[in-house]
Every structure is written in structure tokens, then in C-alpha cells.
Amino acid sequence: MKLTCMMIVAVLFLTAWTFVTAVPHSSNALENLYLKARHEMENPEASKLNTRDDCEPPGNFCGMIKIGPPCCSGWCFFACA
């Protein structure tokens, strides 16, 4: 019983120590990530995720034999939708 209590106290202490000694600028990194995401929501052209240069436009063949980029829309039934 004493060993179990000591183990619980040790785990709680190590968990608290991890949070106390965490990198001080980690909250700043999260804030910067939030600001970047907010900027991309306000200005969709700024987002890199909206560009898909390596995809096939609608109407191009995309059957199982073809090895190449996927359809831009994500839908393929022998031709890109």
C-alpha cells in the first residue's frame, strides 16, 4: 500500500515538474499558429492547402491503370468528376 502511494505521488510530482519546466515560449507558438490560421480564414488565397498543382482537372482519365496524380475534386469514375 505504501509503495502504491509513493508511486502515485512520484507520478504526480513528475507530471507537475514537466508542466513547470516546459518551454516558456510554447504558448507564444500556439498564439502564432492561431493568428496564422485566422489570417488564412480571412484570406483564403493565403492558404497553401487550397492549391493543388499535382491533380487532374475534370474530364481527364483517372482509371485504375493510370499512374499519376489524383483528381482535383477527389472523385474518380474512369474520368475525373
Swiss-Prot record:
Principal location: secreted
Domain notes per entry: The presence of a 'disulfide through disulfide knot' structurally defines this protein as a knottin.
Keyword Protein biosynthesis in record: no
Signal peptide residues on this chain, from the entry's feature table: 1-22
Keyword terms, alphabetized: Calcium channel impairing toxin, Disulfide bond, Ion channel impairing toxin, Knottin, Neurotoxin, Presynaptic neurotoxin, Secreted, Signal, Toxin, Voltage-gated calcium channel impairing toxin
Disulfide bond entries: 55-72, 62-76, 71-80
Family named by the database record: Belongs to the conotoxin O1 superfamily.
GO molecular function: calcium channel regulator activity; ion channel inhibitor activity; toxin activity
Chain positions listed as propeptide in the UniProt record: 23-52
Function statement: Omega-conotoxins act at presynaptic membranes, they bind and block voltage-gated calcium channels (Cav).
Record's subcellular location: Secreted
GO cellular component: extracellular region; host cell presynaptic membrane
Annotated source species: Conus textile (Cloth-of-gold cone)
Official protein name in the record: Omega-conotoxin-like TxMKLT1-0223
Tissues in which the UniProt entry reports expression: Expressed by the venom duct.
Domain of life of the organism encoding this protein: Eukaryota
